[in-house]
């Protein structure tokens, strides 16, 4: 109660099981308790949402999350780097006080330009994103038909549940 800042941090899509976070619920909770919201959308950027903007778009909470972080090395094909976006005041503070930011190098302009081009492409044409989701659904269906326990999901992450750690390590 007596903290200057409170923050709820969540993945947009959880990498181990492909579950998409309930960001409406998270944002409602944050408003109730006067918290900031930070979403790591590394497994959603380019894949989830009407234009591929991520889980905040898919959950209709754009503008309610205070910080969004993501990577350029999944759907955006940059192979390195990432980004943090948010309200100007928060970004300015991070630029001044975030040690990882202070001691890192800027991304090469070509990587940034390529990622921006991919964002334009996937926001204008859903065919690549549709294909990824179709492939994931096909994989789910075929693995279930072979007797594997495959949970349903709304993301392209498809966990194969073995429930046997030694077997999973083989």
Regions found by a protein language model. Name each.
Residues 1-39:
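Active-site phosphate-binding strand-loop segment of PLP-dependent enzymes
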Residues 80-81, 98-107:
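A short glycine-threonine-serine/GTX helix/turn-capping micro-motif
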Residues 13-17, 44-47, 101-102, 159-160:
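Short, small-residue-enriched loops and turns at beta-alpha junctions
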Residues 130-139, 145-170:
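Conserved PLP-binding catalytic core of the aspartate aminotransferase-like
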Residues 6, 104-105, 149-154:
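Short beta-strand
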């Amino acid at each position: 109660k007596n903290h200057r800042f409170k923050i709820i941090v969540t993945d947009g899509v959880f990498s181990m099981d492909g579950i998409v976070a309930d960001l409406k619920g998270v944002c409602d909770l944050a408003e109730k308790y006067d918290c900031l919201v930070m979403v790591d959308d590394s497994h959603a950027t380019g894949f989830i949402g009407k234009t591929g903007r991520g889980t905040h778009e898919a959950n209709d909470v754009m503008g309610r999350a205070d910080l969004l972080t993501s990577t350029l090395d999944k759907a955006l094909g940059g192979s390195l780097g990432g980004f943090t976006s948010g309200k100007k005041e928060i970004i300015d503070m991070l630029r001044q006080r975030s040690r990882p930011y202070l001691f890192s190098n800027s991304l090469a302009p070509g990587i940034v330009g390529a990622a921006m081009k991919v964002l334009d492409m996937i926001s204008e044409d859903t065919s690549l994103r549709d294909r990824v989701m179709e492939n994931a659904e096909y994989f789910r269906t075929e693995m279930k038909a072979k007797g594997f326990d495959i949970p349903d999901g709304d993301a392209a992450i498809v966990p194969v549940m073995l429930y046997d750690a030694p077997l999973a390590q083989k």
